[in-house]
């Protein structure tokens, strides 16, 4: 059978007219390869960096590498059922997590799904996990304190609302303990907390959650957990998800505190993803943008102005500034703070609390090295009474450590040096504190007052802590009005100083310690 050209054209025209063409907005591609949770996709020409991709079986992924002829994506969740040739669709959405007060008291994964067995979370709002930090114009200087309840931190390296204070040290030297004590101490202080656990053992995370529950701190805390058994993608995303949950409170004129425990594990997870995506490795095999990984996260912790809050809430909240305070944790190897990730995070943050294994093993806990630890902005936020009383304590302790090292070789020391060493020993003892027992402002003030005015000088070192505890009990029973004044005003007037001198003398005479 032969068709002439006119018949062929008629046939084509009729076929074209009868064609039902519906344009699908979504772009589609095909899986080329799947390895270690990384998928290479061909044909996604319209995809955005960081866009959510839909795989078969209701599985989602994140587009991270946009190359000329393919897209590199990381799978969020299980990937065993994904195979070569599967169809992948773009969603046109960036990854979002649920936010809001409904999350308080709950344990969630990096995507905001509940993992505590307490049922679904009915959050009314979701927000993108990647956001640009507030600009310079919208920020305010740090002026209100975050009371950690730890004598050595509140006196020597104070933390303010909106500050980023790094907790750095080797493994097993009390970094998590400092962070958890800070969360426990926020009870009744109108500060919401987010604890982000990255790459930790599930049992360790459970211990923290149990302790927060026992102390009643879980009711104002959100726990975001990406344990060691979860994929590198989840460990990489968890800090950003937690930060978005904290920003919800910051942007509505409230105060929030976020602990990232720890960012070393996040850097390891990101390094793993980057190497699998075939990005060129740099120093210590980290990718070139590992600094940006942490800087864009920590810059989102800020104190924002009243104008920012009013603009963000469309005038619903007026005259209130909000803050997000960050306590990132970094684990060092053998005390080496000059490694790549520690130096990066030290340069991004507003100070660091340096914990030492030697001090920890010597029974000085929290094991804070006074000479290296610093708070670059927290001094402005310190309460007046603590600022007044803690003036020289950091210098004294740093000098004491230097002298103590020198005194091991010197046999005959002059009187002034001997006095400084004795005072240093007692102050070091005074700053020791058991875990899960944070102190109130008046308790810290009284302890510092006793040390500054020489009331500890004639005590044996072993008597210092019993003396401090006995003094607190004595003041509670005999001078409750003085305690209330210090707590309410956060100041120590001349009259109160005289009263405190009298109380201390009376207590020492009684010998009830």
Swiss-Prot record:
Entry GO MF terms: ADP binding; ATP binding; proton-transporting ATP synthase activity, rotational mechanism
Main location: membrane
Keyword list, A-Z: ATP synthesis, ATP-binding, Cell inner membrane, Cell membrane, CF(1), Hydrogen ion transport, Ion transport, Membrane, Nucleotide-binding, Translocase, Transport
UniProt topology in membrane: Peripheral membrane protein
Entry EC no(s): 7.1.2.2
UniProt keyword annotation of Nucleotidyltransferase present: no
Pfam families: ATP-synt_ab (PF00006), ATP-synt_ab_C (PF00306), ATP-synt_ab_N (PF02874)
GO cellular component, one term: plasma membrane
Recorded catalytic activity of this chain's protein: ATP + H2O + 4 H(+)(in) = ADP + phosphate + 5 H(+)(out)
Positions that bind ATP: 169-176
Subcellular location(s) of the protein: Cell inner membrane
Alphabetized InterPro entries for the sequence: ATP_synth_asu-like_sf (IPR023366), ATP_synth_asu_C (IPR000793), ATP_synth_asu_C_sf (IPR038376), ATP_synth_F1_a_nt-bd_dom (IPR033732), ATP_synth_F1_asu (IPR005294), ATPase_a/bsu_AS (IPR020003), ATPase_F1/V1/A1_a/bsu_N (IPR004100), ATPase_F1/V1/A1_a/bsu_N_sf (IPR036121)
Site entry (Required for activity), positions: 373
NCBIfam families: atpA, PRK13343.1
Entries under PANTHER family matching the protein: ATP SYNTHASE SUBUNIT ALPHA, MITOCHONDRIAL
Free-text function comment from the UniProt entry: Produces ATP from ADP in the presence of a proton gradient across the membrane. The alpha chain is a regulatory subunit.
Self-association and partners: F-type ATPases have 2 components, CF(1) - the catalytic core - and CF(0) - the membrane proton channel. CF(1) has five subunits: alpha(3), beta(3), gamma(1), delta(1), epsilon(1). CF(0) has three main subunits: a(1), b(2) and c(9-12). The alpha and beta chains form an alternating ring which encloses part of the gamma chain. CF(1) is attached to CF(0) by a central stalk formed by the gamma and epsilon chains, while a peripheral stalk is formed by the delta and b chains.
Family: Belongs to the ATPase alpha/beta chains family.
Protein name: ATP synthase subunit alpha 2
Organism listed in the record: Paraburkholderia xenovorans (strain LB400)
């Amino acid at each position: 059978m032969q068709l002439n050209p006119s018949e062929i054209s008629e046939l084509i025209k009729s076929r074209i007219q009868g064609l039902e063409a519906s344009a699908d907005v979504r772009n589609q591609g095909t899986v080329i390869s799947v390895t270690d949770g990384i998928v290479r996709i061909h044909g996604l020409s319209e995809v955005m960096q960081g866009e959510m991709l839909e795989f078969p079986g209701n599985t989602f992924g994140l587009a991270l590498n946009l190359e000329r002829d393919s897209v590199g994506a990381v799978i969020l969740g299980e990937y065993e059922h994904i195979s070569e040739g599967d169809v992948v669709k773009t969603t046109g959405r960036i990854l979002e997590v649920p936010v809001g007060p409904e999350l308080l008291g709950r344990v969630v994964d990096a995507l905001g799904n509940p993992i505590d067995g307490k049922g679904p979370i009915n959050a009314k709002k979701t927000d993108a996990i990647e956001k640009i930090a507030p600009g310079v114009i919208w920020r305010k200087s740090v002026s209100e304190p975050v009371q950690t309840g730890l004598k050595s931190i509140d006196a020597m390296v104070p933390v303010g609302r909106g500050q980023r204070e790094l907790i750095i040290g080797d493994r097993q030297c009390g970094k998590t303990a400092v962070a958890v004590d800070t969360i426990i101490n926020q009870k009744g202080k109108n500060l919401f907390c987010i604890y982000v656990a990255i790459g930790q053992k599930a049992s360790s995370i459970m211990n923290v959650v149990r302790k927060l529950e026992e102390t009643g701190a879980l009711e104002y805390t959100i726990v975001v957990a990406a344990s060691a058994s979860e994929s590198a993608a989840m460990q990489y995303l968890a800090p950003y998800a937690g930060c978005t949950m904290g920003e919800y409170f910051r942007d509505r004129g409230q105060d929030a505190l976020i602990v990232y425990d720890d960012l070393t594990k996040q850097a390891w997870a990101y390094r793993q993803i980057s190497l699998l995506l075939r990005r060129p490795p740099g120093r210590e095999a980290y990718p070139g943008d590992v600094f940006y990984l942490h800087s864009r996260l920590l810059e989102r912790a800020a104190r924002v102005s009243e104008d920012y809050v009013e603009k963000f809430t469309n005038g619903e909240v007026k005259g209130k500034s909000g803050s997000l305070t960050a306590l990132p944790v970094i684990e060092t190897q053998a005390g080496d703070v000059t490694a790549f990730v520690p130096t990066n995070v030290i340069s991004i943050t507003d100070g660091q609390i340096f914990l030492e294994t030697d001090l920890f093993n010597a029974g000085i806990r929290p094991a804070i090295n006074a000479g290296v630890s610093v708070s670059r902005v927290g001094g402005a936020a310190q309460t007046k009474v603590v600022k007044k009383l803690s003036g020289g304590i950091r210098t004294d302790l740093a000098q004491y450590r230097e002298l103590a090292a020198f005194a091991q070789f010197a046999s005959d020391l002059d009187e002034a040096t001997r006095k400084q060493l004795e005072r240093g020993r007692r102050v070091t003892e005074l700053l020791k504190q058991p875990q899960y027992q944070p102190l109130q402002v008046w308790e810290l003030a009284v302890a510092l007052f006793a040390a500054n005015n020489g009331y500890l000088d004639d005590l044996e070192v072993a008597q210092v802590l019993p003396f401090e505890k006995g003094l607190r009990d004595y003041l509670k029973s005999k001078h409750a009005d003085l305690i209330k004044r210090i707590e309410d005003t956060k100041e120590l007037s001349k009259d109160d100083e005289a009263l405190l001198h009298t109380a201390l003398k009376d207590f020492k005479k009684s010998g009830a310690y």
